[in-house]
Structures are given as C-alpha cells and as structure tokens.
C-alpha cells in the first residue's frame, strides 16, 4: 500500500533529533549492517524471476533523497524487510530508486531531471539503492556498468575513500572490514560498476553571480558536465549523526546544495581541505555526465573536517505599523580562531505577496530592515569561517496599523415626509448611513404615532410602511457598526386626512430600484377628485435639484424616468381640478448601487466572404457589462493557418490572409472585477462564383377599410453571396395616397399606412454585392369599408387630448340612452382631432346578436331629433354637429353631395328649396329649378305691382271726392227745373259764377212759395253761408243781392 510523502515529519529527523546514536551504540549499528548485508544476499538469491528485467545498480550509505517540487517520493507500507522493499520497487514501473531508512521503505521516481535531490545523512543506517530496469535505463540515464555512480549530483572516489583516514569519523559505527564485506557480497549479484562506494563531498566557493559548480569524481578517467537539478520547493528528509570525535560535526544539507570543484592534484591531507558553502539565489544540485576531453587521476583524497557553528539570529520579532524598522543580530556560540573572522550572509526565505522594504548590512552581523509592509518575513543567516559553517533562522512579523474606530452616522431619507390618503404606504431609507468600517445592524422603532394595534419595529436598512392611518409619526433609526458603536436619528412622517372638495394628489408609493436598472415609471393616475382632474404636472423636488435624470410625460398622469444614478430622487406631482384647485404629492425613488454581473461577450454575426476578398473586421463592440469592460482578446480557435490578427486586444480587430475554408474566432472580454465571458464568430471564405439574385414577394395583399396598413414581404428574395440592397418603388398608376413607414422601402419588408381605396402596384428591386439585380411586382388591393354608409360622426366641443377613456365611456353611455341601445352596441371606430378645440368621433351602432348594423342616416336623424328634445347640458360635451361619415343626400336627383360639408351642390339651373330646409328637416336639396323660380318671382312681382297700383289709385280717388250737400226747394208743379250744385275746383270761376246766377237762385217759386219753408239751424247756416260770402273770385263781378227767400234757404 503506497502513501505519498508530502509535508510530513522527516523520517531522518528521528535519527538527528536526539543524537541517540552515541559511541555506546556502535555495536548495534554493526549488527544492523550485518543484517542488511544478509538480507541483500537473500534478496539476490530469491529474485531469479525478476533478474532479467530488474538488477541492482549502485548502493550508497549515508545518503537520503528529497522531492524536487512534486511528490516523487512515497512511503511503502507493509514492507518489513529489505527484500520485500526491493521486490516491490522492481514490480513498480515508476520506481527506480528506493531508500531504506530504519526499517522504512521509501520509493522514488527520479526518471525526469530535477525530480529528486540527494543529501548526506552521515548515517550508516540510511541506504540508497539504485535499480537498473532495461526498459527504462535510457530514461534514467544510467551509465555503462564500468562507469561510476552519478545520479542526483553524487560522486565519490573509492580509492580515496579506502585510503582516507577520517572516514570513520563520519560513520564510526561501520568498520572497514564490514564495509568491504558487504561490498563483496553485493558484487556477487552485480557487475563491477555496482561497487558500493562511500561519499566524499568537496566544497568550493562560488563566484558573486551565485552560480553552482558540479560534483565530480576523481576515480574516473572522464570529466563530467554539470547538469543542474533545482526546485523551489523541497521536502527535507535529513539525518544527522552525533557521537564522533569532538572536533568533527556533521551538519544537515543546506537548501542551496553543495558543490565541488574537480581537481587534478591528489589531496594529501583531508584536514587542510577548504570547504566553502555557496550562496546561490535558488537552490540547485548538479550531477556529472561523462566528457571524454579530460581525465583525472584515481587517487585517494583526504576527507575534510567541517566544524558546525551554533548560530542564533535571535527570537522572532513582531512589530506593528507605523513602526516599520527592525534590527536583527546574528550570534555565533564559538569564537573565531585568532586572526580569523566569520562572514555573514542574510537571505530572505519567505515574504508576503506584493511586499516591499529595504535591507542594510546584508553581509554583516547586524541586519537593519526598514520600510517594511505588513506580513510575515523569514530570514536565514549563513555564517562561515575556516572549515566552519553554521546557519540561523528568524521570523519578522509586521502587523498592520490598528484602526481607530469612529462611531457610525445614522442617515435617513427623507427626514421629513408628508403623504395624504388614500396613500397608506411609504418607505424611509436608512441605507445611506455611513461608518468607517461596516454597519452590521439597523433597528427602526416607532417613537410617536396614532393609536394602532401594534407599533412598528424592524431591523432592515429600508423601513417599509403600510396601512398607515392619519396622524404624525416619528421613527427612530439606530445603527450599530462592527465595533459595537451606535448612533441614532429620527424621521418624521405626516399622514393627512383625505378632503373631499379639493383634488387628492397621489404620486404612488416610494420606489426602490437597483442599478443597472436606471429607469422607472411613476403613476399619478390614482389621484382623485370629486369632479375630475384636468391637468397633471410632475417636477423634481427642490431637495433633489441638480441630480441627473431624464423625464418624459411631465404633463401626463404617467411620468417616465431614465438615466438615473445612485441616490435618492424626490418628485412632486401637482394636480388641478376643474375649478383650479390644486394638490401636490411627493414620491421618492431610491436608486441603490448595482451588483456586478459577468460581461456579455458579443463577437458579432457570422460572416461569409468570397475571394478575392481575404480580409474582414471582427466587431465585438456590442459586448456589454453592467459596469465596464477593460480588456478584449481575439483568438483564432479553428481554421487554416496563415492568418494575421491586427488589434487583437481591442473591440474591433482586423483579420487578413484568409483562405478558402471556415474560421472560428473567439472573443474574450473581462470587466473591472476580472469576470470574463467568451463568444465566437464564424468566418466562411468561398470561391468567387456569383449568381444574380432572385427577387420574390410573398403574394398579393388584399385589405378592407378601415384597415389602412399593409405589409409586403420580400425577405424570401435570395442570392448566393447575399443581397446588399432592397428598393421598393410604387407604380405610376397607383394612388398617390399612402405612406411608407420607417424608411422600410430600403428593407426586405415594406410597411405601408394611410392607404385609400384602390389598387396599388409595387416593384421590388434586389441587388447583390456584384451589382446584379432582379425585380418582382405585387399588388395591394384596398377595398371600401362595408360599413362606410352606416358610420356616424359627431363633432364634440373638447380638445382631443382632454378626452380620457373614462370620459369617453360616460359619453358612449349617454349616446346609448338617447338611441335606446346598450353601451356595447355602440362601436367606436375612430377618434381624431377635428379642429384645435374640437374632436371627431366616428362610430356605428349594431344590435344584439346577430349584430345587424343600423343604417347610418337613421342613427344620425334619431340622434339629431333626440338632441333637439333634450336639454342643452344633457351630454357631458356639447355636440357641434351630427352627421353620417359619407354624405347620403340624393339632392333631388339634380346635384351631388359634398362629403366634407355634407350639403348638396346643385346642377346648373337648379337650386335649394330653402323653405323646406328652414321649416322642415333641414336637409340640403336641389328641388327648385332656377328658371321656374325666376318666372314665378317675375309673376309675383308683377302681380304685386298691379295690386299695389290699384290699391293706391283707389285710395287717392276716395280721398279727392267732395261731400255732396243737399239743398232742397219747393218745386211748383209747373216748374220742373232742377238745380244741381257742384262745388268742385274743376268747374272754374266761370262755372261758379254760372251757378250763382242759375235759375235755382232766381226761382220765383222760392220767393213766392210760402207753404214749404225749410229753416236750417244757425250752425249749419253759418257753415253754408260762410263759404259763399267770403270773397269774390278774380274777374268776377259781385253778385247781386239775394232775396230774403234765398237768404232763408
């Protein structure tokens, strides 16, 4: 069962921890060595089956392994013997080396460079065995059998080991005879190259560039190249042996590694060997490969004695900003020999990310650190002297400057608020409260308010209130920060009672939105009034002046807001009723900061190119993010090679060098918080084979008025390379009325409106990229409205913008009452402005199922008749005119009806019977012939003239005739003379004179008759005589005197 070695206690440290291997235990190590050799002998004899593929290589004592970054070492459990460890390694294809340490089997995979690192344990109880597997020998890089061990930068000189006197100082528990006996036993199973060789390491100083030399052997005739195996992270498996001579100390291998310098001269004295510890920047090891250019003598070299120095860098230091300076001192327990000094080298091993600071005295005993940033720093000091070496470690912890807590500040918005019923809910925002760290708790409490069932108490940033009753409220907000500090403030809310006579403005409840939503609609249509509201007006409250916002519909019940930013906006709604009374209400819109979302990458639509076009642009500018996109990256993920991307780090990139095939380009976008998104676009490159396009319109269109819009679909047109332009044209024989919407005559689908009765013909011309074109035609037939003759229009005395849906319903209900039908039977077809102050409403009336439509002229006549009977204020709006939409007057078959004025235009020699128009139904007509009217008028005038002359003549004659006065006389029977008196002006003077001297005057009967004498009253006498006695006409002689009888008469 395998168990990988990660960060675990070092097995070898068990040997080093207590220095329990003292001189008194040497016999135990000798016995252990003997047991090990015996196990190896049994192992080689019992593995004949595995000998063909797995053979023992080199065996080394006092050497251990450590991993070079990854887990290349693993502990094999359940292997109580060396034989079982060897067999398990042979069976595992990944095992090339195993390390037998104190009964533990540690296997290793060192097939790759820099995967393993060797170090010296100086303990004979540590054995490193190399295995040669034929199938992996090349991968491991084993040398021929006559070569020396080379793995992991380890080299040795068997002759120098054999002749070196101080080897017992390194492994005092192993005698020379025992060592060579074990080697002879192992050589029985292996080749001459499998000699077990002790390790002799030579150190050489490195130059200032911190480069490491390689370890080489002096027993080979070849020079080895240095191959560096390094790793920034290693697992320390070290062992240290104590109990040797007092002047010899064995140190664990330092993390930088050991290096040797090859020498061509034989070392005569091991005590005079110079040992220097290199100081590389990164830890590294090297091992040698053979080079036939140089050779060295296989002579013995003395083993150097290295004195271990006890070095202390002091206790760990902990400082707190703003203090950022510290001083580290290195102390060596042993004093340097006379005339010599120690050298110091401080190295930074561990440091925080994004650290900074300054070091002073890196190669001195005292290291001064300054300008440190917060974090943990680990320093190592290396002290070296003549054949002496030591290391010390110290930690420096820099803590950030402690924060001085400031109490939070409670902020409410709005602080003073007033609402009126029927609005019974609102919100108060406390999220704008601030603190130097963080607010962890909000608490709302009602301090004062009307008597209700329960008081308000909530623990939210925004207080939402509902079911409020009239009165004054006071709410307290208490905020608590992360350090427990508190702060409070209050907010006042006034809820007014509803009044019935002025209007009640209601701007709706307060709203809360979260960015990126920056638009909202406020509704003031809940405002009420007992007689109706005539105007609405929205405005930004003075407390919110200066804030950026776009407002639309400020004079309508609905206010549309956009382009809002973070913060609180307060708006005021002012409503006015019919008599000019006004009311206001406020609403607060709280815009909270947004929550970041990943960007949305948009690489644009797929593209299709045709050679010779070999370049195009990739447009990712439509990519979006709720905050901001900070980087773009275009990459080719599929397609032929050879393309070039220009401006690949911008939203719009250019790709050139395209060939025939399909390319896939991927766009990656990132926002400010490093969230990213990807999108791909396909670019298809084709050979240049152009075919003309094919224009195709989907069928003819037939519509019936009042529907006056149509849609012509030319999207079925096709082309092999794609259509680049569409052009719709109207035939010259088509009606000129009708409009094209939104410039759709340059798009695949044509939208038409305001069409009139008739047949339209349209032509579609499509053009491709090469200029080839094709055309197609279609017709749009507009049929007349079948209900045209039954439509009734009424002109209302109201502006069209003031006619609301509610008022319209009330008016339709009144019309239904006049006509005796239901509201649902009146179908309003159109409402449009007639003049600036009037509105035209077009409707028709139908009965209950089967929905038979009433005749329009009958409905109009009935409505006119009912309106004459009713009072003037029966309708909510005054009806200026009621008529049919189409003029249906027959004009007495002597003219035609004007559809606009709804009056007859008579034919020549015909005119309107105005008597009938004024006295009867008022409909225009053409009943009278002009000729007959003239003749009749002439006759009437002549008749009137004659009649008038006759009357005048009669009047004059009657006035000019004098009254006849009766004169009586007594006539004799013989005298039959009669007398006629005619006192007229026509008789003249002579006639009068004749009358005076007539026989009547001189009748004797008058004088002589005494029988009949008539007497006149005095009054009558005077009148009669007065006219005769006044004067004498000119040219007349005085009459003779009358006789008494005449006087009496």
Curated annotation (Swiss-Prot):
Keyword tags: Cell membrane, Glycoprotein, Golgi apparatus, Host-virus interaction, Membrane, Phosphoprotein, Repeat, Transmembrane, Transmembrane helix
UniProt domain PKD: residue ranges: 312-401, 409-498, 504-594, 600-688, 694-785
Subcellular location: Cytoplasmic granule membrane; Golgi apparatus membrane; Golgi apparatus, trans-Golgi network membrane; Cell membrane
Ranges of biased composition (kind: Polar residues): 1028-1037
Stretches assigned to the MANSC domain: 49-127
Summary of the tissues where the protein is detected: Expressed in cortical neurons in the brain cortex (at protein level).
Pfam families the UniProt entry points to: K319L-like_PKD (PF22352), KIAA0319 (PF23620), KIAA0319_N (PF23597)
GO BP term, pick one: flagellated sperm motility
Residues with Phosphothreonine modification: 974, 1037
Extracellular side: 51-932
Glycan attachment sites: 247, 395, 472, 487, 525
Membrane topology: Multi-pass membrane protein
Stretches assigned to the Cytoplasmic side: 1-29, 954-1049
Region (Disordered): 1022-1049
PROSITE patterns, A to Z: MANSC, PKD
UniProt modification remark: N-glycosylated.
GO annotations of cellular component type: cytoplasmic vesicle; Golgi apparatus; Golgi membrane; membrane; nucleolus; plasma membrane; trans-Golgi network
Transmembrane segments: 30-50, 933-953
InterPro entries on file: Ig-like_fold (IPR013783), KIAA0319-like (IPR029865), KIAA0319-like_C (IPR056502), MANSC_dom (IPR013980), PKD/Chitinase_dom (IPR022409), PKD_dom (IPR000601), PKD_dom_sf (IPR035986)
Modified residues (Phosphoserine): 978, 1009, 1031
Main location: membrane
Known role: Possible role in axon guidance through interaction with RTN4R.
Subunit structure: Interacts with RTN4R.
Name of the featured protein: Dyslexia-associated protein KIAA0319-like protein
Annotated source species: Homo sapiens (Human)
């Amino acid at each position: 069962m395998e168990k990988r070695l990660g960060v675990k206690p070092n097995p070898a440290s068990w040997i080093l921890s207590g220095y329990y291997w003292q001189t008194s235990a040497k016999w135990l190590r000798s016995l252990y060595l003997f047991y090990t050799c015996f196990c190896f002998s049994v192992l080689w004899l019992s593995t004949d089956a595995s000998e063909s593929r797995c053979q023992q290589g080199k065996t080394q004592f006092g050497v251990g392994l450590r991993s070079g970054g990854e887990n290349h070492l693993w502990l094999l459990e359940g292997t109580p013997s060396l034989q079982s460890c060897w067999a398990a390694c042979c069976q595992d294809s990944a095992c090339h080396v195993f390390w037998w340490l104190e009964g533990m089997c540690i296997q290793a995979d060192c097939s790759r460079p820099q995967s393993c690192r060797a170090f010296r344990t100086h303990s004979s109880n540590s054995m490193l065995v190399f295995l040669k597997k034929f199938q992996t020998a090349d991968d491991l890089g084993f040398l021929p059998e006559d070569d020396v061990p080379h793995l992991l930068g380890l080299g040795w000189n068997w002759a120098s080991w054999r002749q070196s006197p101080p080897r017992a100082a390194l492994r005092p528990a192993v005698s020379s005879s025992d060592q060579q006996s074990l080697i002879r036993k192992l050589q029985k199973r292996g080749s001459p190259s499998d000699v077990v060789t002790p390790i002799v390491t030579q150190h050489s100083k490195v130059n200032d560039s911190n480069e490491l030399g390689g370890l080489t052997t002096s027993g080979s005739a070849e020079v080895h190249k240095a191959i560096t195996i390094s790793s920034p992270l290693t697992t320390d498996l070290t062992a240290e042996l104590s109990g040797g001579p007092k002047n010899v100390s064995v140190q664990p291998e330092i993390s930088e590694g050991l290096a040797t310098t090859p020498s061509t001269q034989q070392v005569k004295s091991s005590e005079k060997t110079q040992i220097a510890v290199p100081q590389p920047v990164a830890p590294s090891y090297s091992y040698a490969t053979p080079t036939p250019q140089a050779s060295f003598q296989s002579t013995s070299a003395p083993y150097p004695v290295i004195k271990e120095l006890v070095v202390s860098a002091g206790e760990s230091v902990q400082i707190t900003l703003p203090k950022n300076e510290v001083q580290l001192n290195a102390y060596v327990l042993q004093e340097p020999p006379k005339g010599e000094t120690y050298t110091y080298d401080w190295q930074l091993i561990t440091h925080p990310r994004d650290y900074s600071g300054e070091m002073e005295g890196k190669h001195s005993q005292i290291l001064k650190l300054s300008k440190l940033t917060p974090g943990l720093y680990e320093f190592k000091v290396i002290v070296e002297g003549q054949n002496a070496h030591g290391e010390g470690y110290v930690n420096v912890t820099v803590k950030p400057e402690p924060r001085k807590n400031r109490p939070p500040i409670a902020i409410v918005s709005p602080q003073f608020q007033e609402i009126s019923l029927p609005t019974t809910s609102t919100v108060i925002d406390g999220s704008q409260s601030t603190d130097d760290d963080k607010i962890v708790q909000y608490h709302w409490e009602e301090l004062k308010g009307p008597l209700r069932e329960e008081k308000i108490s909530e623990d939210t940033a925004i207080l939402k209130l509902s079911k409020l009753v009239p009165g004054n409220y006071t709410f307290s907000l208490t905020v608590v920060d992360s350090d427990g500090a508190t702060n409070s403030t209050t907010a006042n809310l006034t809820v007014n009672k509803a009044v019935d006579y002025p209007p009640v403005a209601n701007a709706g409840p307060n709203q809360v939105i979260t960015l990126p939503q920056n638009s909202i609609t406020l509704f003031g249509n809940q405002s009420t009034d007992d007689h109706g509201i005539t105007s609405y007006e929205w405005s930004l409250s003075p407390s919110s002046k200066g804030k950026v916002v776009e407002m639309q519909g400020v004079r309508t019940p609905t206010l549309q807001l956009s382009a809002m930013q973070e913060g609180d906006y307060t708006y005021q709604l002012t409503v006015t009723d019919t008599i000019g009374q006004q009311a206001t209400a406020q609403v607060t819109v709280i815009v909270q900061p947004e929550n970041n979302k990943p960007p949305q990458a948009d690489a644009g639509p797929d593209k299709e190119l045709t050679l010779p076009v070999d370049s195009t642009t990739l447009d990712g500018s439509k990519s979006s993010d709720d905050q901001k996109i900070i980087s773009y990256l275009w990459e080719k993920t599929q397609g032929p090679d050879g393309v070039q991307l220009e401006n690949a780090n911008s939203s719009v990139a250019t790709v050139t060098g395209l060939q025939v095939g399909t390319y896939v380009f991927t766009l990656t976008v990132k926002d400010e918080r490093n969230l990213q998104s990807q999108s791909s676009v396909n670019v298809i490159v084709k050979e240049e084979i152009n075919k003309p396009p094919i224009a195709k319109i989907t069928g003819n269109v037939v519509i019936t008025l009042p529907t006056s819009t149509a849609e012509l679909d030319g999207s079925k047109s096709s082309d092999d390379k794609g259509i680049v332009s569409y052009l719709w044209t109207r035939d010259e024989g088509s009606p000129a009325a009708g409009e094209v919407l939104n410039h759709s005559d340059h798009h695949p689908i044509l939208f038409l409106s305001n069409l009139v009765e008739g047949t339209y013909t349209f032509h579609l011309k499509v053009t491709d990229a090469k200029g080839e074109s094709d055309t197609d035609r279609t017709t749009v037939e507009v049929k007349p409205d079948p209900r045209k003759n039954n439509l009734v229009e009424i002109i209302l005395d109201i502006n069209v913008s003031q006619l609301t849906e509610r008022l319209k319903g009330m008016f339709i209900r009144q019309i239904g009452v006049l006509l005796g039908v239901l509201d649902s039977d009146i179908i309003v077809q159109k409402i449009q402005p007639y003049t600036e102050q009037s509105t035209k409403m077009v409707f028709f009336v139908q009965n209950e199922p089967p929905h038979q439509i009433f005749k329009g002229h009958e409905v109009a006549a009935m409505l006119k008749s009912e309106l004459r009977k009713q009072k003037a204020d029966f309708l909510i709006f005054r009806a200026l005119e009621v008529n049919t939409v189409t003029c249906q007057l027959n004009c007495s078959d002597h003219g035609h009806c004007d559809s606009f004025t709804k009056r007859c235009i008579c034919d020549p020699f015909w005119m309107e019977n105005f008597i009938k128009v004024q006295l009867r139904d008022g409909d225009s007509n053409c009943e009278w012939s002009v000729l007959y009217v003239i003749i009749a008028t002439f006759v009437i005038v002549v008749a009137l003239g004659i009649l008038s002359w006759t009357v005048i003549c009669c009047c004059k004659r009657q006035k000019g005739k004098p009254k006849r006065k009766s004169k009586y006389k007594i006539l004799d029977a013989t005298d039959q003379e009669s007398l006629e008196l005619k006192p007229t002006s026509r008789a003249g003077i002579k006639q009068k004179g004749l009358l005076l001297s007539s026989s009547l005057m001189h009748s004797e009967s008058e004088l002589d008759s005494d029988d009949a004498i008539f007497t006149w009253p005095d009054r009558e006498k005077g009148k009669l005589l007065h006219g005769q006695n006044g004067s004498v006409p000119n040219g007349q002689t005085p009459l003779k005197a009358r006789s008494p009888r005449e006087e009496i008469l």
